[in-house]
Amino acid sequence: LECNKLVDIAYITCPAGKNL
């Protein structure tokens, strides 16, 4: 999954570095 602030699930599964 890609980092997406609009999608909590995708956002959580993203690497911590990409969460920013």
Curated annotation (Swiss-Prot):
It is found in: Secreted; Target cell membrane. Coiled coil: none annotated. GO terms for cellular component: extracellular region; membrane; other organism cell membrane. The keyword Repressor does not apply. GO terms for molecular function: toxin activity. Expressed by the venom gland. Keywords: Membrane, Secreted, Target cell membrane, Target membrane, Toxin. Belongs to the three-finger toxin family. Short-chain subfamily. Type IA cytotoxin sub-subfamily. Monomer. Homodimerizes during storage at 30 degrees Celsius (observed after 3 days). This three-finger cytotoxin shows cytotoxicity and direct nephrotoxicity. The cytotoxicity has been observed on B16F10 melanoma cells (EC(50)=2.56 uM) and on kidney proximal tubular epithelium LLCPK1 cells (EC(50)=4.79 uM); it is due to necrotic cell death and not to apoptosis. Direct nephrotoxicity has been deduced from binding to LLCPK1 cell line and to kidney membranes. In addition, after intravenous injection into mice tail vein, the toxin principally accumulates in kidney, but only minimally in blood, liver and brain. This is 7.2 kDa cytotoxin RVV-7. It comes from Daboia russelii. The lineage of its organism: Eukaryota, Metazoa, Chordata, Craniata, Vertebrata.
